[in-house]
Amino acid sequence: MGQYYRPVVETTKGGMVSINTYLDGEYERAKLMEQSWYTHPFVNAVVSRLYNKPSKIAWVGDYATSVVDDFPNTPVQELYNTAYGEGSISLDTLKSNDFTLDNKFLVNHDTKEFIDLNKYREENTVGGYCTHPVSLLTALGNGCGSGDFMYHAESEEQVANVGKWAWNTLEITDTAPREYKEVMYLFREN
């Protein structure tokens, strides 16, 4: 059966809120690989919230509770409850915008690392398609349902990196932070 994902972001008061999988009032497909394309309007609308505004973020699958032990420093159960539990709070429908990752950097303030997104796109484009680093690096539950990245990856190393930045403080910036280490992740489909 397919696993569906919802992004969960940190509120300004340190709480958590889920983002509905709707864009401009229309339902957006919610399997991980459906939300893992570089130019996907829904994903970029979510990610635009990180532009010059650091925030914790995770892409939470509806089977994520089966991976709690794989993420000992991540509040997987609380993130799951925020996304899918009774009384979960969700943001209103997102509006599309023209935000892109061109000439930007994805910064992880917890690990003191960053990704040059122009280089990322160059390294990860295969057949004209490129995966989106944010949904894959923050995914919780990969491998628990069809439509997950593990069924599409070129290598086990790529699969192991899915979720590596889940619930870390991320930011999209126009400049690379000087004291941080530049890293590269490959998420290419076979």
Protein language model regions, located:
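Short, extreme N-terminal segment that most often corresponds to the first beta-strand
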Residues: 1-25
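Charged, low-complexity surface segments at secondary-structure and domain boundaries
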Residues: 24-33
